[in-house]
Amino acid sequence: MLSDNAFLRYQRQVCLPEIGESGQQKLCDASVLIIGCGGLGNSAALYLAAAGVGKLVLCDDDEVEISNLSRQIAFRNQHVSTPKVDALAQQLRALNPECHIRTVQRRVDRNLLPLEVAMSDVVLDCSDNLETRHLVNQVCFECQIPLISGAAIGWSGQVIAFDFSAPNKATGCYACMVPRDYSDQLGKCSDLGIIGPVVGTIGNLQALLAIQYLAELPEFKTHQLMTFDAKHLDWQKWQLMADPDCEICAAKEANTNNNEGVICPSL
C-alpha cells in the first residue's frame, strides 16, 4: 500500500491504467543494479529514481572529468575529480530522498558481480567496454536475472533487453549478437566522439524498459534490438536469433564445468 506521500509524488504514473497503484508499489519494492555511471547510467538512474524505484545500486570505478559534462547530465562543475558513483548518488538523493542508493566504487569482476546481480531484480548495463558487457551478460544469464544493455557512439545508439528469468531464456544473449573477438572492430567515444542527446535517448530507453519489466507490462519486449541513427532520426528494430554455437546460452552445462564460469549465489 502506497503511503500518502508516495501517492502524491507518483500520482501522474499511478493514474496510468497500465501502472496503477499496484504497479507503482512494484517499482517501490524493486532493486536495480546500474553498471556504469557515465552518460547512459546518468540518464537511466535519474529517471528510475524519479519514477520511484526503491533501490538503486551504482557501480563504477571512474571519476568525473570535465569532458564528461557535455553528456553526463547529472554532474556539475564541482563534481570534477569526484568519484562518479558519489556524485550521481548525491544528485539522486536530492531528486528523490525515498530512493535508497548504494554505491560500489570499483570495476566489476567475477568476484563482485554474481552477488550484486543476484540481489537485483533487473540489471542495466551502461558500461563502455565489451569486456564488461560480456561478463555482465554471462552473470545475468547464469543468475537468471533480466539484463537491459545499452550502447552509444558518434551519432548512433542501441538498446536491447534480455529476460533471462523467463522459461525460454535460451533464446539468445549479448554474446550471440556481439562475439567476444569483435572488440578490435569497435571504436571509443574518446576517439570517435559522441553527441550528448544520443546517450540520453538510449539511457532513457533503458529506464523505460526497466519500468516496463518491473511493473509487469505485457508490452515489454525481450530479445529485440533497437538501433537509433540520430543524424537522420531513424529507428530500426531487429529480432535477435540465438546462435546455436554461443559459448554462453547454447552450452549451459559446458559453462558450468568451465573454469571461466561464474557461480551465482543462492539468496
Across the structure, where does each feature detected by a protein language model lie?
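Adenine nucleotide-associated cytosolic modules
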Residues: 1-267
